[in-house]
Amino acid sequence: MHAHAAHALGLRVPPPAFPRRRARPRRRPAAAVLATSAAPQRETDPRKRVVITGMGLASVFGSDVDTFYDRLLAGESGVGPIDRFDASSFPTRFAGQIRGFSSEGYIDGKNDRRLDDCIRYCILSGKKALESAGLGAGSDAHVKLDVGRAGVLVGTGMGGLSVFSDGVQNLIEKGYRKISPFFIPYAITNMGSALLAIDVGFMGPNYSISTACATSNYCFYAAANHIRRGEADIIVAGGTEAAIIPIGLGGFVACRALSQRNDDPITACRPWDKERDGFVMGEGAGVLVMESLEHAMKRDAPIIAEYLGGAVNCDAYHMTDPRADGLGVSSCITMSLRDAGVAPEEVNYINAHATSTLAGDLAEVRAIKQVFKNPSEIKINSTKSMIGHCLGAAGGLEAIATIKSITTGWVHPTINQFNPEPEVDFDTVANEKKQHEVNVGISNSFGFGGHNSVVVFAPFKP
């Protein structure tokens, strides 16, 4: 087995043969230790407080936020056999594949046929989020917006993979003259944000971030900082991904990162279970409308929840393997709480990264325990157990699940909890939803390359 593939599965492999630098004593980052001189203080300036006023998504459970969360609460699985292409020759033949997606009313037919699904999911989700924020196209509130202070920041881990794959195939089979003129524009990662901004006329900050499976949280963090610095009033932020195609599936198969439970795909994604054997691919988009409290109040916007803070950092350890000591993740959580003005004792819900991989699941749990000393008070669950791992879109969909847990008072189950690892002594909301009043919730997302990200949400209190 290739070393990187083995690391992706959490297996022990001999150290690489190339020379390493002489090890230096590691200094624990200051961020890894909570300040004890004073109690944390939340932001009070309405210009710097960031609230969530809209949500939109494309998912295996459809494109309606309430339906999406209702099906999560019911413990449904969206995982099943892949039928988008012939996957019979692959060792993994199932995924959280979106079926029956329709962008009618949101993307005109001519463009819809050309666009990569990654961009289609982005545009639909962004426009639905704006509608839920009272900023639908042509609305009075939309017309009155200062578009120079309205931005779009929707990232993707892999970009327009279908368009890229088709372009390469045309080049090989037919020559360069048969490459579509849309090949480059629709393959690059920034085009979803760009086309959404073009459609809605937003002229503020606009770009994409690509940090693998941490992408969405990085976008939320960056968007909030634009608002806090006074550079924008409102930003549509999140992530989108559409990688369930032959080259995407084949790539993750080559990493040996995927579950091969083809005989029972519904139970394949089983975070923290002793019998887990890899993650399940998913797809979709999850987008939030993030807005300064001052701006939201001026336009009498519907305030759903509050973004309290976040943090991003890097393990600086390995391309795919998490740090065994959990330092990167634990320090990221600590920094996010400091940014949010929250003490660890205030957090009582965690939407975990929890992908169902051998190494990743327990590494996250160990890091969480370094920050939260009383795990019995915390509910922790995995959205991926039902919809699969949506890669760059994962954090977006999981942020929506986190916010819905706040607004409904119910946390969705982690399904497929059959034989949990003994280290996992949190309440994982095993197999059945639970009523739970969320005080402060955090959502974790980590990506290949050692990218760590944590965002913090809470009920809005004026």
UniProtKB/Swiss-Prot annotation:
Protein name: 3-oxoacyl-[acyl-carrier-protein] synthase I, chloroplastic
UniProt main location, coarse: plastid
Reactions catalysed according to its record: a fatty acyl-[ACP] + malonyl-[ACP] + H(+) = a 3-oxoacyl-[ACP] + holo-[ACP] + CO2
Biological process terms in GO annotation: fatty acid biosynthetic process
Function: Catalyzes the condensation reaction of fatty acid synthesis by the addition to an acyl acceptor of two carbons from malonyl-ACP.
Record-stated family: Belongs to the thiolase-like superfamily. Beta-ketoacyl-ACP synthases family.
Cellular location(s): Plastid, Chloroplast
Subunit structure as annotated in this protein's UniProt entry: Homodimer.
